[in-house]
Swiss-Prot record:
Cofactor(s) in the UniProt record: dipyrromethane
PANTHER family, per database record: PORPHOBILINOGEN DEAMINASE
Annotated protein name in UniProt: Porphobilinogen deaminase
CDD domains from the UniProt entry: PBP2_HMBS
GO molecular function: hydroxymethylbilane synthase activity
InterPro entries tied to this protein: HemC, Porphobilin_deaminase_cofac_BS, Porphobilin_deaminase_N, Porphobilinogen_deaminase_C, Porphobilinogen_deaminase_C_sf
Upper lineage: Bacteria, Bacillati, Bacillota, Clostridia, Eubacteriales
A GO cellular-component term linked to this record: cytoplasm
Subunit note: Monomer.
EC id: 2.5.1.61
Keywords on record: Porphyrin biosynthesis, Transferase
Cofactor info, note text: Binds 1 dipyrromethane group covalently.
Signal peptide positions on this chain: none
Other notes: The porphobilinogen subunits are added to the dipyrromethane group.
């Protein structure tokens, strides 16, 4: 009997997402034995600093990558938006989920209907930039931790509201906590937001993930991540990308903020869904004027 060991962060959301992958594997072949192996990543342990101060998104995958390299697990499961933008040829992304809700959500303290004077909590420069445009008279402040940790900070009075990815809240069954959804025009999402990624070792067989994988998610992620990567969009850079497929076309929207000049720019391009990477580069070219100092 074939056995597959699945590596995951140990947060409740990460485990739920891993269980979604496991359900698809069982549907493909009920005889495959599955083992879930959870671990804390460096990004989960260091919560008193923003990600750009401690090494970026790679801190959420480092321990899981080591487990793959050392053959302690066979695949690992991630929120794709939290993965580094540079591909690792030895540990490729081998499957992507269908995209769930890509929007960001506004969450108020439990029982709260009126605004208070505390800041709006947000984990990314991307969100903070767009929140300032939506709420020019409100302060924003960084917030770290898993969803439950952030909700506790919110409910204890540290923040007047927080902004989280809608997909994660829904997967946790906490949709009732959402006060409002921001449209993708109000807050443009992070590249690959709402998509779960599965990583494995190069050269191995991953047919067991056929029922999980979405070619549409691969297409839109290639466009979004190409744009963000080429614009040097790490955790400290306010940058966003969102692609949709309409019939045979991809529509790609992007946001870039030049911190040196203070200029922000939104642009949109469209093209054949057969060429998502090229479309990402096309959007980069449209942003060139904003990137110059």
């Amino acid at each position: 009997m074939k056995k597959i060991r699945i590596g995951s962060r140990d947060s409740k959301l990460a485990i739920i997402q891993s269980e979604m992958v496991m359900a698809a594997i069982r549907e493909f072949d009920p005889d495959i034995e599955l083992e879930l192996i959870t671990m804390k990543t460096t990004g989960d342990k260091i919560l008193d600093k923003t990600l750009d101060k401690i090494g970026g998104k790679g801190l959420f995958v480092k321990e899981l990558d080591y487990a793959l390299y050392n053959n302690e697990v066979d695949i690992t499961v991630h929120s794709y938006k939290d993965m580094p933008l540079e591909d690792n040829p030895k540990l490729p992304v081998v499957a992507l989920s269908k995209r769930e809700d890509p929007r960001d959500a506004f969450v108020l303290p439990q029982g709260e209907i009126a605004e208070n004077n505390e800041p709006i909590g947000s984990s990314s420069q991307r969100r903070q930039l767009q929140l300032k445009a939506l709420f020019p008279n409100r302060k924003t402040a960084p917030i770290r931790g898993n969803v439950q940790t952030r909700l506790k900070k919110l409910d204890s009075g540290e923040f007047s509201a927080i902004v989280l990815a809608a997909a994660g809240i829904k997967r946790l069954g906490l949709e009732s906590r959402i006060s409002r959804y921001f449209s993708v025009d109000e807050i443009l999402p992070a590249a690959s937001q709402g998509i779960i990624a599965v990583q494995g070792r190069a050269g191995e067989n991953f047919d067991f993930l056929k029922l999980f994988h979405s070619e549409e998610s691969l297409c839109i992620s290639q466009a979004e991540r190409t744009f963000v990567r080429e614009m040097n969009g790490g955790c400290s850079t306010p940058i966003a990308a969102y692609a949709t497929i309409v019939e045979s076309e991809i529509i790609l929207k992007g946001l870039y903020h030049n911190e040196a000049t203070g200029e922000s720019k939104k642009e949109c391009v469209s093209g054949s869904r057969q060429n998502p990477v090229e479309l990402g580069y096309e959007l980069v070219k449209k942003m060139e004027s904003c990137r110059r100092i």
